[in-house]
Regions:
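Acidic/histidine-rich alpha-helical segments that form the ligand environment
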Residues: 64, 68, 85-139
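Disorder-to-helix initiation segments
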Residues: 1-22, 99, 103
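A generic "alpha-helical surface" signal
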Residues: 17-20, 24, 50, 57, ...
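A structural signal for well-ordered alpha-helices, especially hydrophobic packing surfaces
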Residues: 23, 30, 37, 56, ...
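Residue-level signal for pocket-adjacent positions within structured domains
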Residues: 2, 35, 40-46, 76-79, ...
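Helix-loop segments that flank and shape redox-cofactor active sites
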Residues: 7-14, 28-54, 118-132
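Charged, amphipathic alpha-helical segments and their flanking helix caps
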Residues: 46, 53-64, 123-141, 146-150
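Conserved alpha-helical segments that form or flank metal/cofactor-binding pockets of metalloenzymes
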Residues: 44-83
Length: 156
């Protein structure tokens, strides 16, 4: 059924593409965080194990919300690992073996997503006239800012 929510039809596909690329980024970050949750070792094991668990649970909620936002705009959400890896702007990590490197990698990814989201917020509002997506992305950015702050504080 046709989506008629006040966003020009020509803007729906680019918005969905923006959201699907973000979905891929978030899924890669989710997987990396889950990996670190499973494989962290050392004297801070319990603390970091729980920290990573909270982070991947928050990312899981964000992933679902992003996919649903794309559906609200009348488009399908990408849903395969192959698709995610083809369009993500983040990199996988299977090499980090110490907790400090894990935290630095996660901090880098959260800060990368904050910058991407700042751009996407402006683009969705100004270019595509979609205040709903812009507001949605602002909420995601705030979550990444909070997580980045927690990680920076832990590393300080």
């Amino acid at each position: 059924m046709k989506v008629d929510i006040g966003i020009p039809k020509a803007h729906l596909q680019p918005l969905a593409t923006m959201l699907n690329t973000l979905l891929a980024d978030e899924y890669v970050l989710y997987t990396k965080t889950r990996n670190y949750h499973w494989n962290v070792t050392g004297s801070s094991f319990m603390e970091l194990h729980k920290l990573f668990e909270g982070q991947y649970e928050a990312l899981d909620e964000a992933i679902d919300a992003i996919a649903e936002r794309s559906r609200k705009l009348g488009h399908y959400a990408v849903g395969s690992l192959k698709q995610y890896l083809a369009i993500t702007r983040l990199t996988e990590d299977d090499k980090a073996t110490n907790s400090k490197q894990m935290l630095l990698n996660l901090l880098h990814d959260h800060e990368t997503l904050i910058k991407i989201l700042r751009n996407d917020i402006a683009t969705s509002a100004d270019k595509y006239k979609d205040a709903g997506t812009s507001d949605f992305l602002t909420g995601l950015m705030k979550e990444h800012e909070m997580t980045a702050w927690f990680i920076r504080s832990y590393l300080s």
